[in-house]
A protein has these predicted regions:
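Conserved mixed alpha/beta catalytic, RNA-binding, or beta-rich assembly cores of soluble enzyme
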Residues: 1-110, 114-124
Length: 124
C-alpha cells in the first residue's frame, strides 16, 4: 500500500454485457483510465492510472492477482498501444513505451539513475 495514492482503473469486459467497469478514488484518473480503455477497445484488458505513487509500488501486487495474465507496461512515459483488429474485435499486440535511446550513459548518468531508482523503491 502507498499512503496518499490516487488511482483510476478501467477494465474492458470481453463477454456478457461487454462494459468498461471502473474503480478508483479520483474521478479524473478514473476518466483517464476509461478514455484509454475506450481508445484501445480490446476485451479483457485493464488500464490503471495513478498519481502520488510509482508503478514499482504496486506492480508486484498486481502481478500476484490470478486474473492478471500479462502486463504490457508499467511506466510514466508516453505510450502507444499496438492493436490488432479482427471481425471478432481488438486485441493488444504490444506497447511502445517512451522514446528510443539517444546515447550510452556516462558514470555521472549512472549515479543519477541509481539515485532516481532508489526514490522509486529499487534496492541495489
Amino acid at each position: 500500500t502507498v499512503p496518499g495514492v490516487k488511482f483510476g482503473l478501467a477494465f474492458s469486459e470481453a463477454s456478457g454485457p461487454c462494459l468498461v467497469r471502473t474503480e478508483g478514488n479520483d474521478e479524473a484518473l478514473v476518466a483517464d483510465a476509461v478514455r484509454a480503455a475506450q481508445a484501445v477497445a480490446a476485451g479483457h484488458s485493464f488500464y490503471l492510472v495513478m498519481k502520488n505513487a510509482y508503478p514499482i509500488n504496486v506492480l508486484t501486487q498486481i502481478k500476484a492477482c490470478q486474473e492478471v495474465a500479462r502486463i504490457f507496461c508499467a511506466t510514466a512515459n508516453p505510450v502507444q498501444v499496438l492493436v490488432a483488429s479482427t471481425p471478432q474485435g481488438n486485441g493488444i499486440v504490444g506497447v511502445v513505451d517512451g522514446a528510443p535511446p539517444k546515447g550510452v550513459e556516462s558514470g555521472k548518468d549512472r549515479a543519477e539513475r541509481r539515485a532516481m531508482l532508489r526514490t522509486f523503491g529499487y534496492k541495489f
